[in-house]
Every structure is written in structure tokens, then in C-alpha cells.
Amino acid sequence: MAKKSKQLRAALEKIDSTKAYSVEEAVALAKETNFAKFDATVEVAYNLNIDVKKADQQIRGAMVLPNGTGKTSRVLVFARGAKAEEAKAAGADFVGEDDLVAKINDGWLDFDVVIATPDMMALVGRLGRVLGPRNLMPNPKTGTVTMDVAKAVEESKGGKITYRADRAGNVQAIIGKVSFEAEKLVENFKAFNETIQKAKPATAKGTYVTNLTITTTQGVGIKVDVNSL
């Protein structure tokens, strides 16, 4: 614990808490100040000036990062017949129907993404209390309720991320690993930022992005200059 505290202090000394950095500077600092002994995840956190209580100001969606996330997602698909075979051929880790519902209800959660064909949603709905709080419930807005299960599986395996604004307007997302080249992290960030900017509600007033930070697992938040975007 003492060693970790020392590493944290060393990281803090390299970051000016009063300064907002360019994206390139923030990414470089995130890599430089990372002290985790594993390949830490690099994340971005936005605070948006929106009112999620209003239906037209709810922000939620999905996108595929140009350089992936550095993580291989375990994909579960609820489908039957030909669609189940398509999911298996596309590389889904688990494919099934009632058998998977029973397994999940028994406490099994060894998966990262859940996809379902529309006709399976009545069945999947039984898992709302389990999947909902974990942001795993399939949703058309994130492309996880679809007849094109092959595409959904391939995207989930190839760097697809989902995002959603919470009640306070905070949006968090993975943009890669510290082992990524800085340029690839910057490219991923810019792609995600473009998505967030395009999602700005027409009724949102004032400054849209009020705060933006980049951080690593166990790392220090580095403020990004929103005016430089």
C-alpha cells in the first residue's frame, strides 16, 4: 500500500491539476503516469449539460472504435434456428434460449455483451432485474436487439462500445489500453468525441461539454481542454 501511495504521489506531481490539457497531452500523461502492473484500461469521462429527465435529452448509443478496445468481449446471443447458427458462425461465445435464461438466473454471468433477436425479447425480459443494473439488457439503440446477429457479434468482438448518460449527465467509455500507441488512443478518442458531439440534443442550452477527463485504471484523472476539441 505504501508503494502504491508513493507511485500515486509521483503521478500527481507530473500532472498540473489547475491545467486543462490537449487530447494529445492528456493521452501522453495517462500513459506516462500509469503505475498499474497490468495493461490498464484508458477511459474518457464527460460531464454534459443535459437534462436526462427530458426524453429528447437522453443520450445513449453504441459505436465501433477504429482501433478497438484492446479487450476481447465474451458475447452471448439469444436466438433460435437459422439466427442461432448465424451467431455461432460469427463467433458468439454462447448461443441459446431458455437454457441460458435458467443459467443466468442461477447466478452465471461470465459474459460481457448480450444480443437478442426481436422475437426473443419476451424471454430475455425475464432477466431484467439481473441484466438491467449491469447495463447488459439488449436494446435497439445500442444495436443489440437485431435480426442481423452476425454483424452485431462481429462488431462486439471488434471494438464496439456502448455509452449512456447517467442522471447527472456523466458519460464514460473505454478508448483502449495503455499498451496502445498514443496515436491510436487519440484516434479512438476523436472518434468517440465526434459521436458525443453529434448526439447533442437540439434542445440542450449553454455549454454542452462542461468537463472532460482521461484516466487509466487506478490512475489519476487528467483534465482535457474542451475548447481544443
Curated annotation (Swiss-Prot):
InterPro entries in the record: Ribosom_uL1_bac-type (IPR005878), Ribosomal_uL1 (IPR002143), Ribosomal_uL1-like (IPR023674), Ribosomal_uL1/biogenesis (IPR028364), Ribosomal_uL1_3-a/b-sand (IPR016095), Ribosomal_uL1_CS (IPR023673)
One MF annotation (Gene Ontology) recorded for this entry: rRNA binding
Keywords: Repressor, Ribonucleoprotein, Ribosomal protein, RNA-binding, rRNA-binding, Translation regulation, tRNA-binding
Lineage: superkingdom: Bacteria
Subunit composition and interactions: Part of the 50S ribosomal subunit.
The protein's name: Large ribosomal subunit protein uL1
GO CC annotations on file: large ribosomal subunit
Physiological role: Binds directly to 23S rRNA. The L1 stalk is quite mobile in the ribosome, and is involved in E site tRNA release.
Family from the record: Belongs to the universal ribosomal protein uL1 family.
A single GO BP: regulation of translation
Organism, scientific name: Streptococcus pneumoniae serotype 4 (strain ATCC BAA-334 / TIGR4)
